[in-house]
Amino acid sequence: MYSYEPDTQIFSRRAMILGVGQLGLFGLLAARLQYLQVTQADQYGILAENNRVNIGLIAPLRGRILDRYGQEIATNRPNFQVVMIPEQTKDPIETLRVLEKLVPISPSRRKRLLRDIPRSRGFVPFTVAENLEWEQFAAINLNLPHLPGVEPQVGKLRYYPQDDIFSHMVGYVGRPDGRDLRRDDPLLKVPGFRIGKSGVEKQFDDKLRGSAGSRRVEVNNVGRVIRELARNPGIQGADLTMSMDSALQNEAISLLGEQSGSVVMMDVNSGEVLTIASAPTFNPNQFTVGLSQKEWDGLLDDQRKPLINKAIAGQYAPGSTVKMLIAIAGLEEKVITPEEKIVCEGQYELGGDTFHCWEHEGHGPMNMHDAITNSCDVYFYELARRLGIDPIERVAKKFGLGRPSIPGAFGEKKGLIPGRDWKRANLDAAWQTGETLIAGIGQGYMLVTPIQLAVMTARLANGGKAVTPQLLMNPQNASNTNDDLVSVDANGAENNDIQVDPAHLKLMHKAMTSVVNDPDGTAFGSRFNLSGVASAGKTGTVQVRRISKDERESGIIPNEELDWHLRDHALFIGFAPVKNPKYSVAVVVEHGGSGSKVAAPIAQKLLKMALERDRQPLKIKTASGAKFNKTKKNTAGTA
């Protein structure tokens, strides 16, 4: 009989081996499972959480920019906007058409949306419109039941409550462009984020920007946001308190009107800049939301160049406004005395060339005081010839001309005070005596900016203290400041004495006082008398075209009959009060025609306004944000 026992034994052995193997495999799986779920639970929990949770940046609230009294120049306001999530709409294109009837959508944005929406992942939101009026925003909310996939949102937008008054110096913000986005800064890619593009907004962007916030959101496997888990709003940027006075700035812009030019007013002792205006202006709020191509082209095509900050980047021949410096150089070099008289017959001859005085009939005998009061060109031709260019160059630079007043900041131009070395290096030619004569009346190669003229005037007024412009209140005590705004002289020292004989400065004060208050003075028509307080100054009318001999003989064409770009520039510098000077002012009106008729009245009205405001108790805002009452009053008939 056949036995099955050997086969059974073989089967049992195989089953045992298989069972042991299975047991071992399950043991390994159990051990691995224990390792993953127990030993590595925390690590894989974090990985799972990271796959489920996204962290995104939130743009911080930008710091404010304030004037010296705490009035807002730049702040933030609610930005009412409309966002569309394409996948939640029945028809994104049709929804866009409906929205166009409720809110304004620019042609460029509409074109971009029509192009990008079909290409996008449906859950990615698109900003359809922003910077909406409350009524428009309310209309969207009322129609939401009929607008699936549309979401009204309230963010923050940079806002300039005084519109164009500070447009050039404060600047504006805008969306990061291609060059910005190449920088390794994830905040630049956050929707709605703005950066400083010009002026103070750009110079202090890192201080004003603040620190980014963040939000943690739960997402599904395709990246769609399910819910928000946590939010950190970030830290608002630091506030900046500028030295400017909104009321004076507004008045300066108003006085310039439709003209092209600039005004700078500063404290002659502290250097605090109260007004730094450039015209025409532009509205920085337009840049915040984006200009249309037509608006941008209009700014570029305007011959008055509204995008240029003329106060610091406009370069002009100073004309007669520098005649006091020529006089000081003559006294320092002892080539003339204040009493010596030079006869003006209306022209000056040198080597066969004729140099004309603005007074064609001549002024007659002129001493230094009278020559400044009447702005006699012939007197200064002769004085410049005696001096040579070297002392003129030295004294001009000592008073702040030919070098930046705010080194490294805002794109300021340094102007030009020419000399022998400059001409040899730049024109490969020797200096000529005739060029010295032209420099003696502030023309030729010589170029200055309005802020340099204000600095020059301040140094003339304050007794030779090398004061420099300060654009922040108490910058040495402020933690949110930039050293670029604490100006220094060429030797790196702040507000040093520039080594001028006080007696020489006293002579200049008397002559400049006569310019405004003497009936023979070129600015007599714009004088003011505020309870015994008077001002001093100097006019300048700068020729921008060559007048031919034939035209002189037949009669010089009046400015008003010339094309705008051929008319003379109008300049005026001044300070007040005459006793204990406090404010200096410089006014340049491009192609304004006459310093005495156009620029001087603007300066005088501003000086008077500043003196009147000094008599009022005002709240000054310090750099720390605290306020204190400061009553400014006149003493001994001065302010």
Which stretches of residues belong to each language-model region?
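Secretory targeting signals
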Residues: 1-10, 23-24
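Beta-lactam-recognizing serine transpeptidase/beta-lactamase-like catalytic domain environment
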Residues: 2-5, 219-229, 269-321, 325-586, ...
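N-terminal export leaders
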Residues: 13-17
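Aromatic-capped interface at the extracytoplasmic side
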Residues: 33-55
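Short, small/polar residue-rich loop motifs at catalytic or cofactor-binding pockets
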Residues: 57-61, 212, 257-261
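Short beta->alpha transition motifs characteristic of CBS
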Residues: 60, 76-81, 275-281
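Small/polar-residue-rich segments within soluble enzyme cores
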Residues: 94-101, 115-237, 517, 544-555, ...
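Conserved, well-ordered alpha-helix/loop/beta-strand core segments that scaffold catalytic motifs
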Residues: 224-262
